[in-house]
A protein has these predicted regions:
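N-terminal accessory regions of S-adenosyl-L-methionine
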Residues: 1-101
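Conserved alpha-helix/loop element of class I SAM-dependent methyltransferases that forms part
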Residues: 105-125
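Conserved class I S-adenosyl-L-methionine
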Residues: 122-134
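Conserved SAM-binding loop of SAM-dependent methyltransferases across substrates and taxa
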Residues: 134-146
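Conserved SAM-binding motif I beta-strand of class I
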Residues: 147-153
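S-adenosyl-L-methionine
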Residues: 160-189
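A short glycine-rich, Lys/Arg-flanked "PGG" loop and its adjoining helix->strand segment in the class I
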Residues: 209-226
């Protein structure tokens, strides 16, 4: 992440994945999300339907393998979801990404501190986002090509975040984990540039555990990195946690 002085002297940026790569990743994530939404009987029915289509298309001229069946299942889901071909997706994607980079799309007010941070972001910057009320910031940062790890201890909510990320074609830049507040996701880099946590998550911990959490996050934050504590309903204001910081 650029410091204020470095804004005028941006270093060479790391190459982004191609649009083709992002498209294929988007398709894969939509298909996997659809599979995850099905019950076991529904998955079996889907497999039987795919098998019937294979037999109708190829007769006896095929050797059934798990890979082949999976490919036909994916084709069937692709059709059910009416996923766009690359050319149409590309036109939509460019407009979508521009809109996604606006804080208001995610319900984030322009006075939010994260908005002032956006001009300083660089490709390859990393962020750890913790807690449901911080999820909109995860989407916004991912739209700005930040490598985001979102963590929460509510599996249902984390699944919802994962689905939203897939629908918004942000999957390349945002990974989700279900994890206790005191446990860092396994793929978290040794240091990150941005840490965001909501007060509801902190409020559930004892004072001792809270200090342990914040000190652990500070230790994993890169020099000149940023910590942002965002407010949650029925929780203490973010300012209540300033005493945990030395400065």
């Amino acid at each position: 992440m650029l410091t204020a002085l470095q804004l005028q002297q941006q270093r060479r940026r790391r190459a982004l994945p191609s649009l083709k790569q992002q498209y294929h990743e988007y398709i894969l994530q939509r298909i996997e999300a659809y599979k995850d939404s099905l019950s076991r009987p529904e998955l079996l029915d889907l497999g039987n339907e795919a098998l019937a289509e294979m037999e109708a298309a190829q007769g006896d001229q095929f050797l059934l393998t798990e890979v082949l069946l999976t490919d036909w299942v994916d084709r069937l889901i692709h059709k059910r979801l009416s996923l766009q071909p690359y050319s149409r997706w590309l036109k939509h994607f460019k407009l979508l990404r521009s809109a996604q980079r606006e804080p208001t799309r995610w319900g984030i007010e322009r006075r939010c501190p994260i908005v002032r941070l956006l001009p300083r972001l660089e490709q390859g910057d990393t962020a750890l986002i913790i807690g449901g009320d911080a999820a909109p910031i995860a989407y916004l940062l991912a739209a700005h090509d930040v490598e985001v790890i979102f963590a929460g201890n509510d599996m249902t909510f984390v699944d919802q975040v994962e689905s939203r990320v897939a629908e918004e074609a942000l999957g390349h830049f945002c990974t989700t984990y279900v994890a206790p507040t005191t446990d860092f996701p396994p793929e978290l880099p040794p240091q990150v540039n941005i840490v965001v946590i909501d007060t509801a998550t902190l409020g559930k911990e004892t004072s001792t555990r809270r200090r342990h959490v914040l000190e652990g996050l500070m230790a994993r934050t890169a020099p000149c990195g940023i910590h942002l504590i965002v407010p949650s309903e029925h929780s203490l204001a973010p300012e209540a946690y300033l005493s945990h910081y030395a400065e």
